[in-house]
Regions:
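Nucleotide phosphate-binding/pyrophosphate-handling subdomain across enzymes
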Residues: 3, 15-23, 130, 262-368
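Residue-level signal for inorganic ion chemistry
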Residues: 20, 66, 107, 136, ...
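Phosphate-binding loop of NTP-binding sites
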Residues: 2, 21-22, 58-61, 70-214, ...
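C-terminal helical cap/extension that packs against the catalytic core
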Residues: 39-41, 357-412
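Beta-strand->loop->alpha-helix junctions that form or flank phosphate-binding loops
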Residues: 51-54, 90-94, 227-247, 296-300, ...
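Residue-level detector of alpha-helix initiation sites
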Residues: 11, 73, 111-115, 275, ...
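Short internal beta-strands
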Residues: 26-32, 210-214, 346-347, 366-375
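N-terminal leader/targeting and accessory segments in enzymes
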Residues: 1-91, 95, 382, 392
Length: 445
């Protein structure tokens, strides 16, 4: 019996353990952190051996194959030992893909992944298809394949997941954009990060489709290096030669594989970045064969994604917007670009090698104040203090919201769009967004 070791017992690891057990492997799960009770119960229910708080080296190095949590960097000591030994290391998505013939619609990109993935799932589910949501959002793909298999899966993929995928094939692959992000995990080399994102196209055949943003200079440059067999489906904000998705004369238009159009005003998602997300999602659904009436309805009634330009409300005349998912500079740029009132920008957190020069002009144009929120705000001071905009330095969400109240005037917008990861002060970006919303709503009480 082959031995599979799973490192990390979160959503993906616990799900992979269940599928591996079902497929007859000897399974051992190891997590250096504390495992959540629900995942312990799931593994106990399937008689899966697990450990937490440490790694038993002998058991792990005895594996025939290792499934690694995407959160574990390749520099981790145990990963280095496994690599030196030549043990295959794969992702949960790669493993799950071996045990299903379902159609895979896969989405990656530095920004817009969650919105686009959620929109595609919303439309396909509305059409009555048997579809699952997996990857960075939804339930573990492996667990769904093991216990509630579907005919279609819509999967959000990070670069970390793609790093350990080799044989997996996306029937519809979407690459929204490539901008600097997570460079701390890629030796601060943009090409390493780009190579990871381009892995979404691997193993595609003539029967498959690759949807990408035609105006992304990095993507178009990379395409020249790849001899892709899949059908290329570029989209753009405006009509360009070769593009099969675009906006023209106030209409949202697709012309592959069938012609579809609807008034742009009917689209539920607003902002330039959401034009791209909606075009990519519409093309994917059109390729899958969603009827045009359902496609129009889905693009019109999609409610949006939590923590992504989420309107929290208007309190004491000030609008509050939660964009906690903006964990890189490019995401913050799109958020600022969509602002129509004087903005108090909340920025800061765990810096991932950010270049703030990309947003300085927009900050000068849009912002009436800046509130720094992080354990160490020195880099923010170095970049923004000289702009002549009022700034405040804070180290907790409570102090941050209080500073925003001090700076904001009626009619202004307070925008939490941090450019950074959240792990310096918060559990995750969701925790950061929830704390922000709770404190803001308390203003109105």
């Amino acid at each position: 019996m082959s031995k599979i070791v799973i490192l990390g017992a979160g959503e993906s690891g616990a799900g992979a353990a269940v599928l591996a057990k079902k497929e007859g492997f000897e399974v051992f799960v190891s997590d250096m952190s504390k495992i959540k009770d629900n995942y312990k119960k799931l593994m106990d229910d399937h008689n899966i051996e697990w450990e937490e708080g440490h790694h038993t080296k002998e058991k792990i190095l005895d594996a025939d194959e290792v499934i690694k949590s995407p959160g574990i960097p390749k520099e981790a000591p145990m990963i280095q030992k496994l690599m030196a030994k030549g043990t295959p290391i794969i992702s949960e998505i790669e493993f799950a893909g071996r045990y299903t013939d379902a159609k895979m619609i896969c989405i990656t990109g530095s920004n817009g992944k969650t919105t686009t993935t959620s929109l595609i799932y919303h439309i396909i589910k509305s059409a009555g298809y048997d579809v699952g949501l997996a990857g960075n959002i939804g339930k573990s793909l492996a667990l769904q394949v093991a216990e509630t298999p579907h005919k279609y899966y819509v999967i959000e993929l990070s670069s970390f997941q793609l790093d350990n995928m080799y044989e997996f094939r996306a029937n519809v692959a979407i690459l929204l954009n490539i901008t600097p992000d997570h460079l701390d995990r890629y030796e601060f080399k943009m090409q390493n990060y780009t190579d990871a994102k381009m892995r979404i196209t691997q193993n595609q055949t003539e029967e498959d489709s690759f949807i990408f943003w035609n105006d992304d200079p990095i993507v178009t440059k990379e395409l020249a290096k790849y001899n892709l067999k899949s059908h290329l489906c570029p989209f753009s904000e405006f009509k360009e030669e070769g593009c099969v998705g675009f906006i023209e004369d106030g209409k949202y238009k697709l012309n592959f594989p069938s012609d579809f159009e609807m008034p742009q005003a009917d689209m539920s998602l607003r902002g330039k970045h959401n034009i791209y997300n909606s075009l990519a999602a519409g093309l994917a659904c059109n390729i899958v064969g969603i009827d045009h009436e359902t496609l129009h309805k889905g693009l019109s009634d999609f409610p949006g994604v939590e923590h992504r330009l989420e309107k929290v409300g208007k309190f004491q005349g000030v609008y509050y917007v939660n964009d906690s998912k903006a964990t890189n500079v490019d995401a913050c740029w799109y958020a600022l670009e969509s602002m129509t009132t004087p903005t108090i920008l909340i920025i800061g957190g765990k810096d991932k090698g950010n270049d703030y020069n990309q947003i300085k002009n927009l900050v000068k144009e849009k912002c009436a104040g800046i509130v720094y929120l992080g354990a160490d705000n020195q880099k923010l001071h170095d970049n923004f203090d000289s702009l002549g905009i009022p700034v405040r330095d804070t180290h907790s969400m409570k102090d941050c919201v209080a500073a925003c109240q001090e700076l904001a005037k009626p009619g202004d917008t307070v925008l939490l769009s941090p450019c950074c990861a959240s792990f310096d002060l918060f559990k995750n970006m969701e925790d950061r967004g929830e704390q922000f919303k709770a404190l803001v709503r308390a203003i109105g009480e």
